[in-house]
Amino acid sequence: MEWLNETFAGFDGGVFRAMHSLAEAAGGFLTPLTKLVTFIGEKGIVYFLAAIVLMLFPKTRRAGVCVFGAVGLGAILTSLTLKGIVGRERPFLANETFRAFWEFVGSPHEDGFCFPSGHVTSVTAAATALFVFFNKKWSGAGFFAVLLMAFSRVYLIAHYATDTLAGMLVGALSCAVAWGITKGIFCLLEKYPENKFCTFCLTFDVRALFRRAPKPPENGENE
């Protein structure tokens, strides 16, 4: 969308030029690292898997549900909604200078629109959910992953800097909505403790599947 490119041309262009200068100074060293970061965040698969693991334990189940919901909602808002509505082309397709930067850094071709960044939305949604439920000192480190992902997407000229900022906003909003839904779900489950399904959802612990059953006493052992 032209108005978006024109409005933030100075900011996005300045960030791209800084990234290109960094790429020239690094001599290609950062390209494989940023590609790896992008690969890890692809489709939000890592975050969904982490959420499933968290849901297997009673103490972390709420966090797992919130992470899963936040990342899922973020994907719906970005890939299935906002990208199509805004229709912003990838920077290497919209500007010859940015295309030259893209070719220099050796970034792979990416299809689809770019606003907001799906990668940044997903990692922000997951990091925010973890921050809400876990120790702030350690879970706060997840926001470093957000900055790293944003850096990698702009460095590879796959996104404008404004795409990544929008992704952060959408990710945080997705987490807020998912947190409210998670809270409602568990309030409902706790309201009906006599219901077997509710009890199962609240108390199931995957570790119980791997615990050895106590051996029956041998004949004469207790005599």
Show which residues each predicted segment covers.
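Membrane-water interface at transmembrane helix exits
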Residues: 54, 78, 82-87, 131, ...
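Membrane-helix interface segments
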Residues: 27-30, 59-64, 92, 134-141
